[in-house]
Amino acid sequence: MDTYQPPIFELSQPGKHGTNLPALDVPEVEFPAALLRQDDLNDFVELTEPEVMRHYTRISQRNYCIDTGFYPLGSCTMKFNGKLHEEVARYVGFATAHPLQGDALSQGALRIMAELQRDLAEISGFDEVSLQPAAGAQGEFTGILAFRAYHLDRSDHDRVEVLVPDAAHGTNPATAAMAGLKVVEVKSDRRGNVDMDDLRGKLSHRTAGMMLTNPNTLGLFEDEIVEICDIVHGAGGLMYGDGANFNAILGIAKPGKLGFDFMHYNLHKTFTTPHGGGGPGSGAVGCTAALAPFLPGPRVRERSGEAFADPTQSQQPTSAADASPLQYELFTPEKSIGRMKAFHGNFGMLVRAWTYIRTLGEVGLREVSETAVLNANYIRVKLADLYPQAIDRICMHESVLKGQIVGAPKDIRTIDIAKRLIDYGFHPPTVYFPLIVPEALMIEPTETESKPTLDSFIAAMRDIAREAVETPELLREAPTSAPVRRLDEVRAARQPILRYNAEAFAKLRAGE
């Protein structure tokens, strides 16, 4: 059976249509030329409704997602998203709320936001939280802008450098550069942690702060984190916590108590709001009281001791005693860096995170991290004899192995292992990250996977290691069972075709 599904543009046939319109029984109206499309409609698709439906249904059946299988992407926390959270987010009062309907008609939504702010602050050990940033990278940008505003507010104009570990997520240096600051790289030591001597040597009166992920991108806990924070603070800098790996320490360690001044939470990772496919996400941020005046607004706070007019009621309260005990309003901090996003963040994601926290409670959140760490170490230990470890020590929520299989030909690489996993029915782990590890395989199983699932993945990885030694051509040719064989990823990156073009597609098929 031919598994190829051509682009919908190539299925089009002139004269086909999905809807029959009634005969025109009103006068024709001529639209002004300025309102009419000027380019041609050569690529306008003409198909029947069943053909359109079948095309997209076939494509959807090829999707791989967390609802269909194990998704061990390192540094992505692809945990299963509970469906209760989806149900709550779809409540009509939340799903149909409009950000311009005003505080009085948004009390339920504002209460959700206020309680989530409080919960995230408690879980992380920070004083204040803003829910506005739309994703982790935007949360980072928020934090570094707040750092810059904090230093400028103190007339400390020399602090223009941000320290970033060599194992950091790529968004860290990009964030600092976008904020107009200089990036200074800090080396890792042989244990995979920050090299303390290198850190001390790069601190100066120009240091605005340091960005650090803990656990780091090697999946290892920075066990000298308190000293790192003390050293940076001693030099007048601030500590930014990249919360990408927060799933490893819920209920175990609080970044705000360890010495961090600011951190973003990836609600779409740690707090099980769906992610992948472009969003939406949520990069809520927490900070110390000293940085709270610079948070983006508006934020939510509880009103107390005053009457609140409700336009839906004919009888209005005349005193605070008559008012509802739970009343919330939006406000902007006095020295706010301004909005990071229109309105109030991705509200549906906030509802899901709020539900997740209440579903699990304090004990459940700690169990999340304990199980995530256990699962990651189980995989690490079961594969370490065939796939060398990047750093030979206990990991946290994810492990980093090398695709340099013991006994395999030298030309068998991580990309071959990843492609072969597709033939075994698994989504590949993250590959070639962190950049400081040659042939890196970053595996994050999360807490929602069962031992039988982990054992199946381990068995597949061990089978692939055997194939790499005995029949390496299987890896070189993989995937063989997917609808599309191995892609030319270099060409795709260098010559992207981002919209359909018949001529370009014809050249691709001809191998040009």
Question: For each predicted feature, which ranges?
Answer:
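Conserved phosphate/anionic-ligand binding catalytic regions in large, soluble enzymes, centered on
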Residues: 64-85, 132-143, 271-286, 343-349, ...
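A short, small-residue-rich loop immediately preceding and capping a beta-strand
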Residues: 127-133, 161-164
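General small-molecule cofactor/ligand-binding pocket signal
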Residues: 130, 184-186, 429
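Short, flexible loop/turn elements at secondary-structure junctions
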Residues: 77, 135, 168, 216, ...
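Conserved PLP-enzyme active-site core in the AAT-like
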Residues: 108-111, 138-302, 308, 325-327, ...
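Non-catalytic terminal extensions of PLP-dependent enzymes
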Residues: 1-127, 145, 253, 303, ...
